[in-house]
Amino acid sequence: MALALRRLDARPDCRVTAVSRLYRTPPWGKTDQADFYNSCALVETTLSAKALLAVCLDIERDMKRERIERWGPRTIDIDILTYDDERHGEEALKVPHPRMTERAFVLMPLADIAADLPVDGRPVSDWLGDSDAGGIVVANENRAWWRG
């Protein structure tokens, strides 16, 4: 995950401006696997949402991401949760992310960097208050964990 953030930040058309704490999360969906690590980042970019998605997918491929099993183990998973006030409903790009408000493992790190961000008419902090964060723990408090 740190490598993916550094790769984004190294691009001339992207700048990582904030990164959440790193969280360890029990597996979700398919539970017979190791814990996941989750974080969120705020990225300023001159790329369109679709172009940013293409960059993220390239980073995933370079990091040997294989899409074998839904909710299964993976080396990296980069999602675009929001993109300004834009809405996208294509199969490959759904923004805002359609399930982000149901997932504490998304909302906790997102609240670290954008607690007041409105998503579907409510701030992230409100969505987080309604979610089940059981088992999610901070793995690294240092917000510079990704810098290596």
What are these regions (language model features)?
Residues 1-6, 40-44, 67-71:
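A broad, low-specificity signal for short, low-complexity segments enriched in glycine/proline
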